[in-house]
A protein has these predicted regions:
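N-terminal leader/linker segments that initiate helical-solenoid repeat arrays
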Residues: 16, 22-81, 88, 329-332
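Start-of-helix register in tetratricopeptide repeats
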Residues: 43, 77, 111-112, 146, ...
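Residue-level recognition of tetratricopeptide repeat
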Residues: 50, 84, 118-119, 153, ...
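Structural signature of tandem alpha-helical TPR/SEL1-like repeats
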Residues: 55-63, 89-98, 122-135, 158-167, ...
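Conserved structural position within tetratricopeptide repeats
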Residues: 67-70, 101-104, 135-139, 169-173, ...
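Canonical tetratricopeptide repeat
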Residues: 81, 115-116, 150, 184, ...
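Alpha-helical adaptor scaffolds
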Residues: 115-118, 220-225, 248-277
């Protein structure tokens, strides 16, 4: 089972934070019902675990934490760090088990790593459990942005798009509507197969942030996927190029759009030429330039560029290029 892999530094910081937390809790022994002697033993093993970790001695740190577990088997924090350490030494099933125990002992605080393990498992059954966990956590922590974001991701992992949008609504109440909110909603609608709503979400955000280049790029992507009218796509490409006149993909795609819709071929050639000057071995750019030359009757020059495009093309790029190649080279 795949679990988030922690670096040594991350584990150390977690231990240090936990150790400081325990040291600072004067009522800790009373809270857990431990005697002073047992509390001292517990702290001794926590410090020993930290020292072992300082020297990258994971096995020794693990042994010390297991003593802590024996002294207080109901301590969720100990269970969570045992999960982290078992993961560090590649004992994934034990790691998952301890993270699960930590969550069950303290669901309001020990849900994050357990949720990450469930999410990364890639297993449908575990993803269903993740959604149940996420729903429980937001009831326990209704003002926690991370908890609502976890529910959003859990819902998406289960293809529950309605729940994902509800979680995003709650996130927006907590932190306001912004670019991240718009992007999250856009992705949900795309995943749900609702391109019109995805486009509407992008346009909603652009209404308040009209200079955001990335969202204009999102807009034209969804327009092309929807086979939107030529003039609509053209207007979006023009806006993109106003914001970034040297955006190569936009130059190439706008040039090709003009070519296949009977637009201004001189303008298309000029834009396409700029892309191959910047990236002379880019198969996609070469293909576009060759096709525009062909449409203008310049097949001799077009042949040179389409041959170069085919030589440089990756396997997944070849289908469209081969079609153009056969037409330009007049092959059957």
């Amino acid at each position: 089972m795949a679990i988030y892999k922690f670096t040594y530094l991350q584990i150390y910081k977690l231990f240090l934070a936990a150790w400081l937390l325990l040291v600072g809790q004067g009522a800790w022994a009373v809270e857990y019902g431990l005697s002073t002697e047992r509390e001292q033993q517990f702290m001794y093993h926590w410090v020993a675990a930290r020292d072992a970790l300082d020297h990258s001695q994971y096995d020794a740190a693990l042994a010390q934490l297991l003593f802590c577990e024996q002294l207080n088997p109901q301590d969720a924090l100990t269970k969570e760090y045992l999960g982290v350490l078992y993961n560090a030494i590649n004992q994934k099933e034990k790691a998952f088990g301890y993270l699960q125990q930590a969550y069950r002992l303290d669901p309001a605080k020990r849900w994050y790593l357990y949720s990450a393990a469930l999410y990364k498992s890639g297993d449908k059954k575990q993803h269903k459990t993740l959604l149940q966990v996420a729903k429980r956590v937001v009831k326990l922590q209704p003002k926690d942005e991370d908890a609502w974001n976890n529910l959003r991701q859990a819902a998406l992992a289960n293809d529950d798009y309605k729940q994902a949008l509800k979680a995003q609504d709650e996130l927006d109440k907590l932190r306001g509507y912004d670019g991240l909110s718009a992007l999250n909603r856009y992705r949900v609608y795309v995943m749900a197969g609702k391109p019109k709503k995805a486009l509407a979400e992008i346009e909603r955000y652009l209404a308040q942030d009209s200079l955001n280049l990335q969202f204009w790029l999102f807009k034209v992507q969804i327009q092309e996927a929807m086979h939107a009218p030529f003039r609509d796509c053209e207007a979006t490409y023009r806006q993109i190029l106003r914001l970034d006149p040297n955006h190569l993909s936009a130059l190439n795609n706008y040039a090709y759009l003009l070519a296949i819709h009977g637009g201004d071929l001189r303008l298309a050639e000029s834009m396409s030429q700029r892309t191959i000057q910047a990236q002379p071995d880019n198969a996609t750019f070469l293909d576009t330039y060759a096709w525009i030359l062909h449409l203008q009757g310049q097949d001799y020059l077009a042949a040179f560029y389409i041959q170069k495009a085919l030589r440089n093309a990756a396997e997944e790029e070849k289908e469209e290029i081969v079609k153009h190649y056969k037409i330009i080279m007049k092959e059957p």
